Design a protein with these regions (language model features):
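Vicinal oxygen chelate
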Residues: 1, 14-29, 36, 43-50, 55, 74-153
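Short, structured motif recognition centered on aromatic/hydrophobic residues
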Residues: 7-14, 23-24, 47, 52-58, ...
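Amide-forming acyltransferase catalytic core, primarily the GNAT-like/NAT-type
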Residues: 5, 33-39, 44, 97
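Regulatory and interaction patches adjacent to catalytic/ligand-binding sites
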Residues: 71
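A low-complexity, Ser/Thr/Gly/Pro-enriched, surface-exposed linker/loop concept
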Residues: 62-66
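N-terminal beta-strand motif that seeds the catalytic metal site of vicinal oxygen chelate
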Residues: 1-21, 77-84, 134-153
Length: 153
């Protein structure tokens, strides 16, 4: 069975959110979230473009070692990941794994569940699979979820 999926957002690794933000503002983007994640060593800002497009800027926290510092050192700023919202992450993972696609790093976080399809499985692109839980909308509001509702609702 084909999983219920839609593009949620594109994540862009930057040295500085402040340096990346002016272009987004010129294009009419509205910042929905700006949050620091000390546990993972990065700050992220989430933007809405139109009513169905989202971009995320990811900036490393100074002095913190994280996935993002390694990424920026190896590749420089640019596309980090494409996030696909899924209605059922476990079902989606099962479908992919049955077809031989490797899925890694399944994690339950506050507000969402996530897993990743590594670039080696997806033409060089890191795909984040994300299933929102109720807490995400409570914390960040309906605009943080495309169309104000989670996929499959």
């Amino acid at each position: 069975m084909t999983p219920l999926v839609r593009v949620d957002h594109i994540g862009i690794a930057v040295e500085s959110i402040a340096d990346g933000e002016p272009l987004l503002e010129l294009l009419g983007a509205e910042k929905l979230v700006h949050k620091r994640d000390d546990d993972q060593g990065f700050t992220w800002a989430y933007y809405e473009l139109g009513n169905a497009s989202r971009l995320e800027l990811l900036e490393p926290i100074d002095g913190a070692e994280s996935f993002l510092t390694g990424f920026l050192e190896a590749r420089g700023p640019g596309l980090h990941h494409v996030t696909l919202e899924v209605a059922d992450i476990e079902g989606t993972m099962a479908v992919l794994e049955e077809e031989g696609v490797r899925v890694i790093d399944y994690t339950e976080r506050d507000g969402y569940l996530e897993a990743f399809v590594p670039p080696s499985e997806a033409a060089g692109v890191l795909f984040q699979l994300m299933e929102y839980t109720g807490d995400f909308q409570v914390e960040f509001g309906d605009k943080a979820v495309i169309g104000g509702s989670r996929l499959g609702e």
